[in-house]
Regions:
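A short beta-turn/loop motif at secondary-structure boundaries
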Residues: 38-41, 66-67, 103-106
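Vicinal oxygen chelate
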Residues: 7, 17-20, 76-120, 125
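Short beta-strand micro-motifs in enzyme catalytic cores
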Residues: 44-46, 73, 109-111
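Short, charged/polar surface micro-motifs in flexible loops or helix N-caps
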Residues: 53-55, 66-68, 82-85
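Core segments of cupin and vicinal oxygen chelate
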Residues: 3, 14-55
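Hydrophobic adenine-recognition pocket in adenosine-nucleotide-binding enzymes
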Residues: 12, 75
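Short, charged/polar, Gly/Pro-enriched secondary-structure boundary elements
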Residues: 53-58, 118-122
């Protein structure tokens, strides 16, 4: 078997139920910018990024049905220090998010909270 080339993570795709609600959350709570929006086949798509050099880090597709569970365990965002974890916590509280959970893992400090469709978000250092 040949060796794999060096790879880096490119982007995450999420099947969503309510694309407007999810775009609102990811832009207003997590600081993403909506970079593009349109149709891909029969699905409405939204592209979001926090990196001005990347067209998208997340693509959302309005393809999930109301009765389908999310299959994402968690989406994790690394920050530089405890102050930035605390800022994320305070921002989530101010946004009225329920189910916020700060956790000391010993090797990392994290805050967890759900997005509007139940995907678990982690901000950690």
């Amino acid at each position: 078997m040949s060796e794999l080339p060096r790879m880096s993570f490119g982007h995450l795709g999420i099947d969503v139920i309510d694309i407007d609600q999810m775009v609102d959350f990811y832009t207003n709570v997590l600081g993403f910018k909506l970079t593009d929006r349109g149709l891909g086949g029969k699905a409405e798509l939204a592209f979001l990024s926090r990196n001005p050099e990347e067209h998208h880090q997340i693509v959302m597709a309005a393809t999930r049905k109301d009765n389908e569970r999310t299959t994402i365990n968690q989406i994790s965002f690394r920050v530089n220090d405890f102050q930035e974890v605390r800022q994320a916590y305070d921002h989530a509280v101010a946004a009225g998010i329920e189910g916020i959970e700060p956790v000391d893992h010993g090797s990392a400090l994290s805050v967890y909270f759900p997005d509007p469709e139940g995907n678990r978000i982690e901000v950690y250092m």
